[in-house]
């Protein structure tokens, strides 16, 4: 895989990404307002250089205002709409795959009341509508809730991972490499967290 671009409003996040992917094009911008022309041109250039490659759009959407860690605090309605801004990227770059990472409560995305609190009877309504809208661009969708520690991360957080794939492209999630207790099995060993 070759990472060719990154958009993030946080300069520290961009600096970290640039250190790990120095050949990628970096934009320290808000995804809602980024002028897409340079990104579109860069992707077109990469498609010519690598005509058999798949274009994957990875989005780690802001999660603070979905997370249960927010407790009973009011949510920022604007921050909860960042997923809606994905559509202009889909239309501009027509990726083969879209991969999403977020807190598992992202699936409960629904309306807020006048005090900024989630309306329980609407839990999941906006999420389901959003998934249907992305699928309307010709994608199929599968999601999983995965524990990052099962894949070698130094934290044991359960996270939402969603994959949208065009047409008949395969959707595959990785097999775990670790487990809480570790295990030896017929097909290999799972390392202990």
Model-inferred region functions:
Residues 10, 32, 62, 103-104:
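Anionic group-transfer/hydrolysis microenvironments
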Residues 37-53, 63-193:
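Class I S-adenosyl-L-methionine
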């Amino acid at each position: 895989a070759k990472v060719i671009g990154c958009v993030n409003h946080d300069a520290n996040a961009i600096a970290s990404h640039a250190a790990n992917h120095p050949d990628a094009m970096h934009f320290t911008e808000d995804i809602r307002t980024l002028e897409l022309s340079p990104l579109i041109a860069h992707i077109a250039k990469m498609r010519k250089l690598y005509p058999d490659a798949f274009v994957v759009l990875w989005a780690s959407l802001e999660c603070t205002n979905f997370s249960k860690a927010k407790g009973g605090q009011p949510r920022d309605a604007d921050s909860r709409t960042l997923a809606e801004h994905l559509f202009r990227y889909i239309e501009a770059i027509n990726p083969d795959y879209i991969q999403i990472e977020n807190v598992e409560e992202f699936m409960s995305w629904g309306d807020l009341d006048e005090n900024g609190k989630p309306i329980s009877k609407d839990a999941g309504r906006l999420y389901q509508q959003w998934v249907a809208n992305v699928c309307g661009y010709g994608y199929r969708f599968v999601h999983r809730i995965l524990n990052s520690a099962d894949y070698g991360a130094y934290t044991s957080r359960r996270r939402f991972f969603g994959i949208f794939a065009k047409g008949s492209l395969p959707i595959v999630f990785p097999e775990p490499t670790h487990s809480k207790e570790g295990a030896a099995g017929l097909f290999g060993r799972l390392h202990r967290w």
